[in-house]
Amino acid sequence: TENTELRLRFQRNRDRDGSRPIFFQSGAENNCFPGTRSLGSYNSTSTDNTNQWYCGEIKPRDVYLNDAPVTQGFPPLLGIPSTLRGQPAGALIYDTRAGLPFSGVERDLDLFTASFRWDIMGSGYSMVLNGGTRDEDRKTGADSDHSQVNIIGPDINGVRALATGSSAARDTYEDWSGELRIESPQDDRFRWMLGVYHFEWENRNYRIDFASPGGQTRPSQIFDIINTGYFGSVGFDFTDRLSATLEMRSATERKGQIDWTQVPNVPAGPTAAAVYDSSIRGNDEWKSTTPRATVDFKLNEDVTLFAIWAKGYKPGGFNGAVAITNGRPLDESFKQEESVNYELGMKSQLMDRRLTLNVSVFKMTIDDIQLTTPITNATTGAVTSISTNQGDGEIKGLEIESRFAATDDLTLGFTYALADTKFTNGIDDFQFQITSGGGIFNPANPTDPARNLNGRGNGSIVGNPFPLAAKHTASLTADYSRPVFGGGYRLYVNSDLSYTSKKNIQVHNTAYTGSALLMGARVGIETDNWRAGFYGRNLLDESSAVGATRWLHSYLFGIPATAGPAATLDPGLPSTAVAAYSLPRGIFGTLRRERQIGLELNYKF
C-alpha cells in the first residue's frame, strides 16, 4: 500500500560437491628450527631431518584422498620408510581400501526471509520488522591427515574401522532470527532509532562410519546459541555542515554444548581423581555493550570528512570434550575477543561528480585474539582444531576507493588497502618448542632452563603479524556498456584485476602462502529482462595456495602393534620430561581453482 511494504523471499539450495582440494606438506620437508619434535627423532622414519618447522612459501602439490579403493600407484609420503621392524610398510600404511564411507560435501539448505516496513499513518515515523529462518542438513567427510597415508585398523564387530585421521559427520542446523525497529524520519535535524534483536541457533552432530554411512541415529554433540540484543541511535545536525551520530548496542549471548563421549571431567582439585561421565556439558553467557560514535563535517558540497570511534566484541565459546581428552583442560573454553576501533577519512565526489574518491586511515586494538590450534583426537586419531586466545594485537591501515566515469560508456575503478598487523602481547607453546630445540613450554615457569634445550627458547610472538592476513590488497576494474542493434540491446564488457600479498600461515612468521594476481572478465549482450554472455575467472591461471595452516604428520599414530614398536625414539635424546616428542608438524593447504571459462544466461521475471 502507500504506507506499507512487504518483501518475502524463499531460497532452496542443493549442493553435491566432491572432496575438498587439500594437499599436505610432509614434516620431512621442514627446513628450520632443529629440535626433538621432528621426524628425525624417530627410528621408524626414513629421514634424519631434525627440523621442526618450515620457513618459506607453501607451494601447491598433489592431492591424495582415502575415499575410494586405490586402483593405481602413487609416490610414498616423504619421511615414511619402506619397512617397519623388518616388515614391508606399504600394505600397512597405504591400505588400498576406502578409509572413510563419505568424502566431500552434501548440503540441503532452505532459507526464508521476510521484511515489513510501515510508515506509521503516513507520519514519516517507521516500524520495520525483519525475520528469517534456516534449515540445513549437511554431510561432510575428509581424510584429515590430508596425505596418501591410509592406515585402517582391524574390523570392529565385522565392520570396517575408519582410517586413522579420517572423519565424517552429518550436521543439522536450525535457526531463526527477528528484529523490530522504530525510527524517526531520517532527514530530520534530530533523528533516532530504537530496536530489539533475537537469534536462536541449534546444531546437532551425528558421527558417520561404515556401519552408519548416513549418520548415526543419536547425536554425538549438540550446540546451541541464544543471542538477544537491544540497540538504538541518535543523530543531530548541529549545522548544515556538522553532524554527529551515537549508536549503542547491548547484547547477551548464551552458548551451550553437550558432548556425548566418555571423557574425564576436569578434576576438582590437584589430588582429585578424574571422573568419567557420558557427557561433557558447557553452558555460559557473554555480555557486551558496543558503542559507536560518528562525526561528519562537510568541507563543501562535494567533500565530507568523518571520524569514527567504536568498540566491538566476539563472544567466547567452548572446545568441550576434545580439549579435555587431549590434555588441554584449560582450553575447555575460550574468552571473548574485544576490540577498539578508530577511523578518520574523507568521502568525495569530484570533477562534476565523475570521480568518486574515498580515503580513510584506521587503527584497531584487540584483546584476547581468538585463533585455532590443531590437535589429535586421542581416541580416533582424527586431527581437528580448537579455539584459543593467543594474546593481544593491533592493526593500523589505510583504505582507498575510487571510481571514475571516463566516458559515458566506460567507468574505471581502483581500490587499495594496507593492513599492518602485529601482536603486542602473547605466548605460543609451539613457538617455544621450535626456538628452544623442542623443549616443553611450562607456563608456570616460562624461563625454565631445563626445558630451554638450546638456550634460545622464547615463546613470545610479540611483533609478529597476524596469521592469514594479507598486508596489501588492491584491485583495478573496468566496466564498459553501450547500446547496440538500434538501442534495444546493450553490449557489456567487465574486467577486474586483483592483487593480494603473501599471508603468514601461523603466528611464527616464517611459513606463508604466496601472493596472488587474479584476473576476471565478462562480455555479452543484455536487455532490461535478460543477459547472455561469456565469463572468465582466474584468466592468468594463478596457482598460489588459497590458504594453509600448521598441521600434524600423523602416520606415527595408529600403526597396529603387529608391526612392532614402530614409533620408537632414537637413543641419546633428551628426557621426555623436558623435551617434546609429540607428532611432528606438517602443513596442509588448499588449492586454488584453475582458469575457468563459461557461458551465463540470466532472465528476470
Give the residues covered by each predicted segment.
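Extracellular loop and loop/strand-boundary signature of outer-membrane beta-barrel proteins
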Residues: R97-F102, A163-A169, S177, R181, ...
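Outer-membrane beta-barrel domain signature, strongest for Gram-negative TonB-dependent receptors
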Residues: T1-W192, T356
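Repeated loop/turn-to-beta-strand initiation elements of outer-membrane beta-barrel proteins
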Residues: N3-L6, G124-M127, D188-W192, R241-A244, ...
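Transmembrane beta-strands of outer-membrane beta-barrel pores
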Residues: R12-R16, T133-D137, H198-E202, S250-R254, ...
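Structural signature of Gram-negative outer-membrane beta-barrels, strongest in the C-terminal barrel
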Residues: N3, I182-P185, R191, Y197-F199, ...
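Gram-negative outer-membrane beta-barrel transporters
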Residues: D240-R241, K363-T365, I386-Q506, E600-K604
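Membrane-embedded beta-barrel scaffold of Gram-negative outer-membrane proteins
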Residues: S115-D119, G124-G132, D137-S144, K298-G316, ...
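C-terminal beta-signal and adjacent terminal beta-strands/loops
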Residues: S498-Q506, I525-F605
